[in-house]
């Protein structure tokens, strides 16, 4: 009975998303922001430390997280992979076995917390990686931050009990706000991150994210994780945009040393400030 109730909640949210798609089409007739017409009002850092991999997302239709869902058009899914392309070590149906689970999630820029969702448990994980939602919200536990008049970041699927901010609180770039989890509609632990034009998860439109002071590198291990062969289509957009199959990280200190370690050329990174 509980599973039926949860499925009903997911169905209601899906219907709201469909309503949002229709509303945005009516309002804008398909003329939504893209990388040619929109530049972020804020320069964002990645909402985590260390090396993570983009496993979904980009700024073109071919590699978009969910192109037909305007709010999530420029969303990203991030997780951590080892040298074999695995996202876990040990029992693969246990959240704690996954490298990204419990890692700190950080505010991507200065802003104000405008919405927090904290009531979802972690969803179950299957060996087939079928997506489940064990809570009443497909976002799971989430945080919505306003960074500019029409720029809000959404960070979703957070670990139960890990959110350490409250509505109305001012946060700084790089400040811990929660931990990576497996709550909401998800197949395994990861972070869902997007920038949207308003507070609504349903009727806002997604915005391409300009990242600053980060590095990005094509990684061979991604192909071992995902057989969709989308990696080639996201290569030439960095900086400032990242795409599927790239290993990414923040550059906060010792910039040149980190770039050399990653095999990258300093000259390519015009968005890295000295």
PLM segments and residue spans:
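N-terminal accessory interaction module
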Residues: 1-5, 26-27, 41, 52, ...
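Cationic-aromatic interfacial patches
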Residues: 1-28
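Generic structural motif
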Residues: 52-54, 105-115
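Zn2+-dependent peptidoglycan hydrolase active-site motif and core
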Residues: 100, 110-159
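Short histidine-centered loop motifs in beta-beta connectors
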Residues: 151-174
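Short hydrophobic beta/alpha edge segments that flank linear recognition/processing sites
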Residues: 172-184
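Acidic, glycine-rich catalytic/binding loops that coordinate metals and/or anionic ligands
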Residues: 194-274
